[in-house]
């Protein structure tokens, strides 16, 4: 159970672009957790576990394989086969990217966020994949190409399931600062394309068979029953992204998992993160 999260010192802190020789560009979140069972065993004494989440820039020498694994988790086993994950990991490592680690900069990231410039990479395998997903994306990309003064970022982000959502606001703020530095003159992207996933809470599969139905034909015995009464989010921030999305659509559920695609403008992205941060403060 998360008891305390120290984020105040992160809100206005900017990560340095170049690490100092004897330092790093890391920011820390100190999370204290308790185990209620241990509390009872220790007569009410809390056992406190402190975890420091350190924020780093993408490191091609260390992060490549871990990013591929996180991308495979993001897209799922089926969609991952349609994407050149190695090429996409290279794009991420060549773009404004923030990773979160717990064992120093040489360790594997538990989380990442990246903003890949669309126009600079519009011929990439990943863009070609997105164009085939839905006509709305293909049309939007054409509009961006034809527009001389508008641009968008391909937002890619994933984290291990036990990463707390409290890391998300500083993660976005730090990376958006890096985007402004990369674009120059404190600029930002006009639009952001976010790919994420949701899941069916009550997804279930049952064989329509029992001992009294064994004489029915094989087709009837092999039928599956799917219940999808409720859909929920893997990532808490996606609730807010959907709220402010200019375009939002989803794929059909596959084994209880739904791919979700959103296009937000800059104002919508910032509002989403601000509202998420406000929501977290009430927990």
Swiss-Prot record:
Note: Present with 4590 molecules/cell in log phase SD medium.
Compositionally biased residues, Acidic residues: 20-29
Protein name: Protein BCP1
Region of interest: Disordered: 12-44
One Pfam family cited in the UniProt record for this chain: BCCIP
Entry function: Involved in nuclear export of the lipid kinase MSS4 and of the 60S ribosomal subunit. May also play a role in directing MSS4 to the plasma membrane. Plays a role in actin cytoskeleton organization and vesicular transport.
Localization annotation: Cytoplasm; Nucleus
One Gene Ontology MF term: protein folding chaperone
GO cellular component: cytoplasm; nucleus
Main subcellular location of this protein, as a coarse class: cytoplasm
Organism: Saccharomyces cerevisiae (strain ATCC 204508 / S288c) (Baker's yeast)
GO biological process per UniProt: protein export from nucleus; ribosomal large subunit export from nucleus
Post-translational modification: Phosphorylated by the PHO85-PCL1 kinase complex.
InterPro entries, alphabetized: BCP1_family
Family the UniProt entry places it in: Belongs to the BCP1 family.
Keywords: Cytoplasm, Nucleus, Phosphoprotein, Protein transport, Transport
Phosphothreonine modifications at: 205, 209
